[in-house]
């Protein structure tokens, strides 16, 4: 393994941590309807648990309504039940072959609670990035011990990894700021 390999691994893993954080924040409900709200809803189907997005088309025809169209109509009740039991505070209405989900406006209290959750998710993302940094620094130290790196090369690589860490944590901070702004919009 070379310095370049370690840096490449760091960048890939940090990008994955940012993407995971982005997806988790997208699934937090804001004041308007968007299909990502339901992306993490788990439905009991075919004797297993599956993501709702794998079982149905989810659309947002307007800012206050989501429509779920199951591909298998026998799953309508299971999907309705899963949405009701999710902690999203939504009340699905079964309408023949589809499920309508009105999105009520968020109360101030609920907005603040969602911001706390968003901050927690973001902190988990930052912790993930720091764990990648720690792992990569250990890899560099191993390379130095094996005499594949000089002290100067090690120091340069450590600075590069710190630069990547700062860059990816900044990305998470920007995503969080945008989500907080979105949640506070009335």
Swiss-Prot record:
<keyword id="KW-0648">Protein biosynthesis</keyword>
<dbReference type="GO" id="GO:0005737">
    <property type="term" value="C:cytoplasm"/>
</dbReference>
<protein>
    <recommendedName>
        <fullName>Ribosome-recycling factor</fullName>
    </recommendedName>
</protein>
<comment type="similarity">
    <text>Belongs to the RRF family.</text>
</comment>
<comment type="function">
    <text>Responsible for the release of ribosomes from messenger RNA at the termination of protein biosynthesis. May increase the efficiency of translation by recycling ribosomes from one round of translation to another.</text>
</comment>
<dbReference type="InterPro" id="IPR002661">
    <property type="entry name" value="Ribosome_recyc_fac"/>
</dbReference>
<keyword id="KW-0963">Cytoplasm</keyword>
<dbReference type="GO" id="GO:0043023">
    <property type="term" value="F:ribosomal large subunit binding"/>
</dbReference>
<dbReference type="InterPro" id="IPR023584">
    <property type="entry name" value="Ribosome_recyc_fac_dom"/>
</dbReference>
<dbReference type="GO" id="GO:0006415">
    <property type="term" value="P:translational termination"/>
</dbReference>
<dbReference type="Pfam" id="PF01765">
    <property type="entry name" value="RRF"/>
</dbReference>
<dbReference type="InterPro" id="IPR036191">
    <property type="entry name" value="RRF_sf"/>
</dbReference>
């Amino acid at each position: 393994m070379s310095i370049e390999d370690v840096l490449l691994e760091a960048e890939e893993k940090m990008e994955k941590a940012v993407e995971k954080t982005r997806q988790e924040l997208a699934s937090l409900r804001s004041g308007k309807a968007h299909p990502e709200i339901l992306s993490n809803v788990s439905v009991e189907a075919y004797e297993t648990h599956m993501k709702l997005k794998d079982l149905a088309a989810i659309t947002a025809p307007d800012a206050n309504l989501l429509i779920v169209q199951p591909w298998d109509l026998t799953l309508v009740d299971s999907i309705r039940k899963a949405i009701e039991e999710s902690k999203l505070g939504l009340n699905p209405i079964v309408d023949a072959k589809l499920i309508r989900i009105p999105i009520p406006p968020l109360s101030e209290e609920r907005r603040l609670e969602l911001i706390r959750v968003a901050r927690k998710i973001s902190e988990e993302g930052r912790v993930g990035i720091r764990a990648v940094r720690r792992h990569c620094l250990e890899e560099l130290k191993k390379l130095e011990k094996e005499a594949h790196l000089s002290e100067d090369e090690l120091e340069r690589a450590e600075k590069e990894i710190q630069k990547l860490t700062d860059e990816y944590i900044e990305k998470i901070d920007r995503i969080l700021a945008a989500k907080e702004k979105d949640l506070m919009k009335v």
